[in-house]
């Protein structure tokens, strides 16, 4: 009798041919098998959202495939690895406290006119799901965006995507629009910034065109509203957007909103709007980790047909950590610099251009490990192992210390680089090396030699 893992591997392979690629990659591939006994296949989803998605839409397909492969009836259940924070998901709108109980009667959204593809600003052709690199920082938001694109107005309405500047909120929003237009070319997809919504409202008031303004926005099948944080303090704009939101939501039209912060943290935002925005799913996008940044650079290089050495990708990914726009901008500058000067695309040639302030050159974690192992005469494998041999332990501590100085990795990420060490271990290592440097001339000389090889300055980032 085959094991659960064996059965799930076969089922997953069968589903890959049956489901769309985005659906398979987002919901099936990251899901594992928990157990299989007495005809029950228990699956383990990576997060609550995936679990909900599998149960509500994909469970019959999975069960059918499992039954077909095993040759007997198989019941499928889905568990989630982690619990979704209560503040991020409100399953029932009645659970949200509404402060405004004397709202005017809500208007129904008018039926959409036929034969018109788009009636608000066109979407950027580059912002599609296929060009979005999914990392741990964005997996939830990507999965939610895909679910909304496939079934608008059903699962999460509204979908509120929040995150810092340049992390991919606009990309995901517009990808939803592109996806819907591919499925339904006649869909009325409206992508609009909050500034444009406000300006349109002002013009409508000046020209006595409020009815046309309302019809225009409330006829959308899918409305994508960017930078909603700029609505703060604009009382009349908030009033009009509130009624537009209600008209669309009650008609089952999908609303997607993006902001640089959660609804509750937008100052001077009406409580009734906060409540509406929290009715669906709030999906957060964090800054990408090193691996995701490298994947983003590799993806962009492939799209632009550029051949880049891996150490250069590692260098740029380690040097620019705040957002994706900055990261891609650095790559563009590096390529332009090499093209203009005729220099090869190497870390040595582009690093001075990417670090014009002379405040120290960032390095990749792999470079730190390589140079430390070279100077301290241990192997990189030993440094990342659990061995406690004194020479290896000291080299490992030096590596953690210099990685903290020369890269933008957090303490937990440094620990991961050294074989999954805890962040407290990294903190201890840094403290130990700082103490020893003041009393051990030999160690100080070795550390300085590594610094020189890596071009790391001596300023501590603690």
Swiss-Prot record:
Residues 339-462 are annotated as: Domain IV, binds dsDNA. Keywords: ATP-binding, Cytoplasm, DNA replication, DNA-binding, Lipid-binding, Nucleotide-binding. ATP binds at residues 166, 168-170. PROSITE patterns: DNAA. GO terms for cellular component: cytoplasm; plasma membrane. SMART domains: AAA, Bac_DnaA_C. Its main location: cytoplasm. It is found in: Cytoplasm. Belongs to the DnaA family. PANTHER family: CHROMOSOMAL REPLICATION INITIATOR PROTEIN DNAA (PTHR30050:SF2). Plays an essential role in the initiation and regulation of chromosomal replication. ATP-DnaA binds to the origin of replication (oriC) to initiate formation of the DNA replication initiation complex once per cell cycle. Binds the DnaA box (a 9 base pair repeat at the origin) and separates the double-stranded (ds)DNA. Forms a right-handed helical filament on oriC DNA; dsDNA binds to the exterior of the filament while single-stranded (ss)DNA is stabiized in the filament's interior. Domain I is involved in oligomerization and binding regulators, domain II is flexibile and of varying length in different bacteria, domain III forms the AAA+ region, while domain IV binds dsDNA. Oligomerizes as a right-handed, spiral filament on DNA at oriC. This is Chromosomal replication initiator protein DnaA. It comes from Synechococcus sp. (strain CC9902). The gene is dnaA.
């Amino acid at each position: 009798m085959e094991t659960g893992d064996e059965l799930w591997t076969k089922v997953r392979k069968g589903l890959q041919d049956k489901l769309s690629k985005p659906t398979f990659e987002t919901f099936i591939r990251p899901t594992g098998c928990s157990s299989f006994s007495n005809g029950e296949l228990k699956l383990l989803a990576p997060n609550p959202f995936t679990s909900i998605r599998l149960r509500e839409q994909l469970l019959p397909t999975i069960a059918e495939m499992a039954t077909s492969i095993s040759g007997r009836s198989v019941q499928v259940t889905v568990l989630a690895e982690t619990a979704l924070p209560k503040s991020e998901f409100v399953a029932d709108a009645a659970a949200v406290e509404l402060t405004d109980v004397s709202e005017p009667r809500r208007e129904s959204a008018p039926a959409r006119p036929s034969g018109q593809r788009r009636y608000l600003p066109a979407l950027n052709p580059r912002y599609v799901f296929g060009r979005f690199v999914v990392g741990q920082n964005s997996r939830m938001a990507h999965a939610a965006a895909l679910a909304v694109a496939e079934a608008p107005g059903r699962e999460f309405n509204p979908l509120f995507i929040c995150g810092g500047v340049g992390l991919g909120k606009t990309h995901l929003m517009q990808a939803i629009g592109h996806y819907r237009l591919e499925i339904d070319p006649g869909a009325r997809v409206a992508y609009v910034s909050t500034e444009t919504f406000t300006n349109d409202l002002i013009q409508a008031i000046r020209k006595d065109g409020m009815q046309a303004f309302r019809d225009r926005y409330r006829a959308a099948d899918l409305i994508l509203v960017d930078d909603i944080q700029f609505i703060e303090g604009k009382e009349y704009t908030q009033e009009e957007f509130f009624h537009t939101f209600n008209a669309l939501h009650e008609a089952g039209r999908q609303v997607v909103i993006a902001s640089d912060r959660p609804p509750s943290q937008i100052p001077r935002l009406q409580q009734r709007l906060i409540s509406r925005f929290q009715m669906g799913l709030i999906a957060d996008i964090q800054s990408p980790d090193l691996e995701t940044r490298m994947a983003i650079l590799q993806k962009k290089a492939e799209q632009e047909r550029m051949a880049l050495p891996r150490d250069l990708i590692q260098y740029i990914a380690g040097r620019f950590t705040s957002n994706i726009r900055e990261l891609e901008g650095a790559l563009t500058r590096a390529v332009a610099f090499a093209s203009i000067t005729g220099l090869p695309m190497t870390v040595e040639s582009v690093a001075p251009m990417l670090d014009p302030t002379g405040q120290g050159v960032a390095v990749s974690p792999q470079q730190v490990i390589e140079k430390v192992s070279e100077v301290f005469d241990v192997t990189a494998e030993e440094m990342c192992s659990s061995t406690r041999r004194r020479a290896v332990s000291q080299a490992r501590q030096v590596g953690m210390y210099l990685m903290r100085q020369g890269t933008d990795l957090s303490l937990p990420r440094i620990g991961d680089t050294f074989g999954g060490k805890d962040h407290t271990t990294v903190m201890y290592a840094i403290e130990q090396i700082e103490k020893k440097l003041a009393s051990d001339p030999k160690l100080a000389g070795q550390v300085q030699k590594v610094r020189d090889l890596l071009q790391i300055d001596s300023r501590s980032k603690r």
